[in-house]
Amino acid sequence: MSSNFDKFQKRRLISSYFSVVLSVFLVLFLLGVLGLFIINSKKLADDFKEKIAMTVFFKNEANDSIIKAFNSELKRAPFALSYVYVTKEKAAKEHTDIIGEDFLTFLGENPLLNSYDIHLKADYVERDSILKIESALRKNTMIEDIVYDKQLVNLVNDNIKKVSMWILIISGFLTVIAVLLINSSLRLSIHSNRFIIKTMQMVGATKSFIRKPFVMRSVKLGMLGALLAIIALIGLLFYVETNFPGLGILEDKALIGLVLLAVFGLGVLITWVSTHFATQRFLNLRTDDLY
């Protein structure tokens, strides 16, 4: 009879441990996926921003020395990611290729201007930053005009802000759910040991002494769940990289490592905090309340 009871207790204990590891694994895996999505969504947003070009047109009076001086200025400019000089002849050829007709034959002259196509760094593709850059460039009296898609810049930045806000809301919601799920699993695990906790307290053991083995065990289970989540996340990363190489999901290894480290840290932190408060709850209960 005693043997059967011991087997039952052992099975219940294993089941309790398994539920803790599983809940930690699932929750941290979801949070890890969200973290990886956040760092890659910023990368995708930056890539899109850096594709928006600003075109600087020069007056016909601008000679080669002025063009070269402007080129040197761009080399030193902190906002310039890349730039290409487009001569009026090259621009005319491109227009001819697009419309399929040589417009120079009936115009008699080339009305186009020499220009620079400038791609800005993502941090500078903001409404205020671009206006400052435009204002600074217009001080050059040889510049005829500066053209870029203002509506697209505003639209991109507004949408990025909206997406970022929703990501933060979802992250906060998932974090709360994570803590509640893991906390619930740990409380159920400790609940089965409530009489042991109270017995140890009655024979004079200090609260910290009673808490220690439960906290250590839960932290180990949290570490196991976190490691399983990290393995699953690494597998997911390689799967995405293999099937969608164009995304370049493995390029920023430092940030990926930071996300994986955060997943492991959360596994330890959440289980430690949850177990601490769960054991404290049973330590504060009266003996009659244990039943």
From Swiss-Prot:
It is found in: Cell inner membrane. Coiled coil: none annotated. GO terms for biological process: cell division; cell gliding; response to virus. It is a multi-pass membrane protein. The keyword Membrane applies. Residues 1-18, 184-220, 275-291 are cytoplasmic. InterPro entries: ABC3_permease_C, FtsX, FtsX_ECD. Residues 40-162, 242-253 are periplasmic. GO terms for cellular component: Gram-negative-bacterium-type cell wall; plasma membrane. Required for cell division and gliding motility. PANTHER family: CELL DIVISION PROTEIN FTSX. This is Cell division protein FtsX. It comes from Flavobacterium johnsoniae (strain ATCC 17061 / DSM 2064 / JCM 8514 / BCRC 14874 / CCUG 350202 / NBRC 14942 / NCIMB 11054 / UW101).
